Amino acid sequence: MSRPQRLTSSSPWDCSGGVFDWDAALRKLDELNARVEDPTLWDRPSEAQAVSRDRASLAARVGAVQELEGGLKDALEYAELADMEGDEALLEDARAQLKDLKDRAGRAELEALLSGEADGNDCYVEINSGAGGTESCDWAGMLLRMYSRWANAHKMSVELVEETAGDQVGIKSATLLVKGANAYGWLKTEAGVHRLVRISPYDAAAKRHTSFASAWVYPVVDDTIEIDINPSDVRTDTYRASGAGGQHINKTDSAVRLTHIPTGIAVACQAGRSQHQNREEAWKMLRARLYEAELQRREAAQQALEDQKTDIGWGHQIRSYVLQPYQMVKDLRTNVETSDTQGVLDGDLDAFMGASLAQRVGATRDA
């Protein structure tokens, strides 16, 4: 594979800050290409998969820079031609192209920050309602929809692997499996407690209510990562899957819950049609949870995973969503805020995720 041509225009990243060093990236890509072409590497399948994954990730980032710079060159030439001809319609097209390039460059810059060990992995998003009955269950259901919409907007696949319905509306808990490039890297910034303030549609007196729900995010563990679990440390429970019913409702005890006794970590799966399918997926979820706990222990700048999981209430919020008496979504970690509450609930989360990601990287560098 030939070495990519050195770019002549400035990179969209601040290379001096160490976010994306172009020369170092090309040298690393050369090294990874050479390793992949070494036939002896494939005698070690796990290592070969890891190297191939790293090469694909870096090649995508290098390609993104080249694609953006090529697009910028074309758009500027297009704008210059439109200006020479005095064609306002062509100029408007050129402006739209430049805006699109700016948006893509901004996202690519943020993705360059996704350098954590598991950032490129798929992930599970676990949502739980807090105290508050109907209101909190409804709010948890709104979060489930919000994250599903965000993932779909970014061409990621979403699978509901577990859901416990609320007594009247919404959900008590649910787990999503999100598959896509850097799914964990992006969604890990959403872990924490989310607070909703609104006039309740379920209160005949139309009083304002405050509700809480939590989101916790765990990376999917692929075959190149070894997580040792002693089967005797895991308790298995089976139960009947819950849901809306219908012709596909499972009338056997096909749902599976696994509890890791030493840590108390529990996972459940009921999406499969058989107990075997649910057991297999539950084991994947348990490995993800234990891997995330290990990652947290390695990060001195963050608390351990189980230390984060305190009461879902006032003192542990990451974001506040106020729908009445005014409209405002504010991230309490970064102070990023917007009055477009509906846009946020429809999955427009990039500004919040980007600011939180940049803050995390900054804290790590300052540590």
UniProtKB/Swiss-Prot annotation:
<dbReference type="InterPro" id="IPR000352">
    <property type="entry name" value="Pep_chain_release_fac_I"/>
</dbReference>
<dbReference type="InterPro" id="IPR004374">
    <property type="entry name" value="PrfB"/>
</dbReference>
<protein>
    <recommendedName>
        <fullName>Peptide chain release factor 2</fullName>
    </recommendedName>
</protein>
<dbReference type="GO" id="GO:0016149">
    <property type="term" value="F:translation release factor activity, codon specific"/>
</dbReference>
<feature type="modified residue" description="N5-methylglutamine">
    <location>
        <position position="247"/>
    </location>
</feature>
<comment type="similarity">
    <text>Belongs to the prokaryotic/mitochondrial release factor family.</text>
</comment>
<comment type="function">
    <text>Peptide chain release factor 2 directs the termination of translation in response to the peptide chain termination codons UGA and UAA.</text>
</comment>
<dbReference type="Pfam" id="PF03462">
    <property type="entry name" value="PCRF"/>
</dbReference>
<keyword id="KW-0648">Protein biosynthesis</keyword>
<dbReference type="Pfam" id="PF00472">
    <property type="entry name" value="RF-1"/>
</dbReference>
<dbReference type="InterPro" id="IPR005139">
    <property type="entry name" value="PCRF"/>
</dbReference>
<keyword id="KW-0488">Methylation</keyword>
<keyword id="KW-0963">Cytoplasm</keyword>
<dbReference type="InterPro" id="IPR045853">
    <property type="entry name" value="Pep_chain_release_fac_I_sf"/>
</dbReference>
<dbReference type="GO" id="GO:0005737">
    <property type="term" value="C:cytoplasm"/>
</dbReference>
